[in-house]
A protein has these predicted regions:
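Bacterial Sec-dependent N-terminal signal peptides
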Residues: 1-26
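Glycoside hydrolase catalytic-domain context in secreted enzymes
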Residues: 20-475, 480-493, 498-718
Length: 718
């Protein structure tokens, strides 16, 4: 890794009354015990769960203020509508730069203080076991040492600002699929060598203030109920004295969690509450001393950070912090990885076309890692600034035309729009309560009802329409919703996400024939909470595309995943969306010099389109300043220097964990056998002899090295 920071010197810069890394002193422990002794049993039980979704309750009579928590690893997403969007964790790890990672922590800490946030819910350090995990983008790769060093500097930076960092998710939360029900079955050697080291380093070398348990089970026991994990290892073996909290709704038993070392249930006391714990204490299945220790752990951590003695909000720090913006830019510059540069196509020369679904936006992963920034610089914007008149925009808004206004309610083509049928049930069953014509399918009903007299939850809607193109062509169809949605064309299921979930979306391309009728059917249901449904249809103007490509010397195609296709709560496919792969090859058939800028939180399947691209830039999720950094790399203003923190397989079947990632799908507790043991990532490829498509640590630059006029001089007998 690059320049190492002198820990002592940096801690001298921190808030003067804090010790380096905010060690919990005997004085802090005693003060916490004194406060606990003054609390009623009811106050103590109420204090070990969230007051709101992202705060702990205040107890004014004891001098305890309200404590604010906030997601997440890539930026502060609570307690203010906008914040700095830093690059994803996997990009940060690709910098291999301790000094810059410390600055990332400082920026996050400053952003937290600007909003009065006490506890940051990051970093995430779960090991990259397979490319399918939806939260890989938040984490730091496949190597325990790199992950541990990255997390250490991140934590030291955050906590130098007087903000508590939270390392998560303890432990072995290496997939999002069935995360509440899947058991990670792992032998102890593998835990100690692969999955524990980053947590251990965070506790013992960075003095992290908080640890978050994971959703999953470990060897058949939920993490929040795992005494060996939380007490024997974390507390007794590693010496952790801080706060052990649950992930949000990852507690499944009051007594089990209370006796297994969990201090804090979030977001609310669904299990560890008065209703459950008072009878348990009376029955002797939980002791009051156990409750006391939980409250003490929370309070002594807050005391160590001065949070009972000072206002956390620092009004001298701007919410849109210049230091944070600059740090986000520096990370993006150093973490983007150049994977391919055939014929030295890069840096770009001559006139460039920029295009693709991600050219006009800065994509990021979804879930608690999603942040709304004050501003962003897209790749198109970044290139426009640097290439000026030598840039042609062929972005989706230029080459695709909205055709929803050409839809008719039926084949008679008398009335434009969609026939909408509304049902007061989730199953589209029976007769619709309301039938009407609507000009589009674009609704965000929030927590309200779709129509007067309808329930706010548990309803469904069907829209039907007909479309007849004038000529052969290609449509791009986008559909998204919260909860279930699905799209049919001529009674064939095209795409969808038919289940209970937060907002997600799907995008497909559909070839069409001129003069042929296409019948569209969109179905939607709302389960509970918010209700959203959106549908858009676009037609590719291929003539405009060909005319544009004929005018340029090279093409930058920005593609990959985004917050709707990669994120918390679901796993993603290894391959890009099929239409994206096909479009890369389509562009390559029209122009010889294609550069692919790829957004993803981990490895992808390159095999279907690798030969179509002369250059490939792994941009990960580069944060709000990512477009500027990518443009600087593409134009040669800076040389790419990122190195992969993962191995990328040729095909999913080559991965060492293939065959043991999804198992026993129908069981209530799904057992995932980590049968590869310690041979995850590059260790597995070393053992199997299979060659990855790109090895761990790979990354090109524009620099060339050469030796000339070499000579050896004999200086002695040997």
């Amino acid at each position: 890794m690059k320049k190492k920071i002198g820990g002592i010197g940096l801690c001298m810069l921190a808030w003067s009354i804090l010790t380096c890394a905010q060690t919990i002193t005997p004085q802090a422990e005693q003060r916490a015990k004194d406060i606990v002794s003054k609390m009623t049993l009811q106050e103590k039980i109420e204090y070990i769960s969230g007051y709101t979704s992202f705060s702990l309750r205040a107890i004014p009579r004891l001098g305890i203020p309200e404590i604010k928590l906030a997601d997440g690893p890539q930026g502060i997403r609570n307690h203010a509508p906008k914040s700095t969007l830093y690059p994803s964790g996997i990009l940060s790890a690709s910098t291999w730069n301790r000094e810059l990672l410390y600055k990332l922590g400082q920026g996050l800490g400053q952003d937290a203080k600007a909003r009065g946030v006490n506890i940051l819910l990051g970093p995430g350090v779960n090991i990259y076991r397979a490319p399918l995990c939806g939260r890989n983008f938040e984490y730091f790769g496949e190597d325990p040492y790199l992950t541990g060093e990255t997390a250490k500097q991140y934590i030291l930076g955050v906590q130098s600002e007087g903000v508590i960092a939270t390392i998560k998710h303890f432990a072995a939360n290496n997939q999002e699929w069935s995360r509440h029900h899947a058991s990670s079955d792992i032998d102890e050697r593998t835990l100690q060598e692969i999955y524990f080291p980053a947590f251990r380093k965070a506790v013992q070398e960075a003095n992290v203030g908080a640890v978050m348990n994971s959703y999953n089970l470990l060897n058949g026991v939920h993490a929040t109920e795992h005494k060996w994990l939380n007490i024997d290892v974390l507390r007794n073996l590693w010496g952790f004295k801080g706060i052990l909290m649950s992930d949000w709704t990852s507690v499944y038993s009051a007594v089990g969690a209370a006796n297994a070392g969990l201090d804090l249930e979030m977001p609310k006391g669904r299990f560890m509450n008065l209703e459950n714990l008072l009878p348990a204490i009376k029955a002797g299945t939980v002791t009051e001393e156990t409750i006391n220790l939980k409250v003490q752990h929370i309070l002594q951590t807050l005391i160590a950070y001065g949070m009972l003695d000072k206002e956390q909000k620092d009004s001298n720090i701007a919410e849109d912090n210049p230091f944070s913006r600059q740090t986000a830019l520096e990370l993006a510059r150093e973490g983007v990885v150049l994977l391919k540069n055939e014929g030295n196509l890069l840096p770009l020369k001559g006139k460039t076309a920029v295009m693709g679904p991600n050219a006009n936006l800065i994509p990021t992963g979804g879930g608690s890692g999603f942040v709304t920034p004050f501003s962003t610089v897209s790749v198109a914007q970044g290139l426009k600034e640097l290439k000026k008149k030598n840039l042609l925009l062929l972005t989706d808004d230029v080459i695709y035309e909205d055709i929803v206004h050409e839809f008719y309610t039926d084949a008679n083509r008398q009335m434009k729009g969609f026939k909408a049928e509304y049902f007061k049930n989730k199953t589209l069953s029976g007769q619709p309560e309301v039938i009407r014509t609507e000009s589009s399918v674009d609704y965000d009903w929030g927590y309200g009802a779709p129509l007067d007299g309808f329930p706010t939850d548990g309803f469904s809607v069907r829209w039907t329409a007909c479309y007849m193109p004038q000529t052969d062509g290609q449509l791009k169809l986008h559909i998204g919703g919260d909860d279930g949605y699905r799209l049919f064309v001529n009674d064939k299921h095209i795409t969808g996400d038919w289940g209970n979930h937060s907002y997600s979306s799907r995008e497909v391309e559909l070839p069409v024939e001129g003069g042929k009728e296409y019948r569209f059917r969109i179905e939607f249901f709302d389960n509970i909470s918010s209700a959203i449904i959106r549908f858009n249809a676009y037609s590719l103007n291929e003539a405009k595309l060909r005319q544009g490509l004929a005018k340029v010397d090279n093409v930058v195609f920005c593609t990959g995943f985004n917050s709707n296709t990669e994120g918390e709560g679901f796993d993603r496919p290894f391959a890009l969306l099929r239409y994206q792969e096909l479009f890369i090859k389509k562009i390559a058939s029209m122009h010889p010099n294609v550069v692919v800028v790829l957004n993803a939180g981990g490895g992808v399947d390159f095999t279907n389109w690798y030969d179509a691209a002369k250059a490939i830039l792994m941009a990960w999720y580069p944060g709000q300043e990512g477009g500027q950094a990518i443009a600087e790399i593409l134009t040669g203003k800076i040389s790419p220097s990122g190195k992969l923190p993962i191995s990328i397989e040729r095909k999913w079947e080559d991965n060492p964990v293939y065959g043991s990632y999804y198992e026993n799908l129908k069981a209530e507790i799904k057992r995932v056998d980590y049968s590869e043991g310690v041979f995850v990532g590059y260790r597995g490829y070393d053992r199997s002899g299979k060659e990855p498509f790109y090895p761990f640590g790979y990354g090109l630059s524009y620099t060339t090295f050469a030796y000339s006029n070499m000579a050896a001089e004999k200086t002695g007998e040997h």
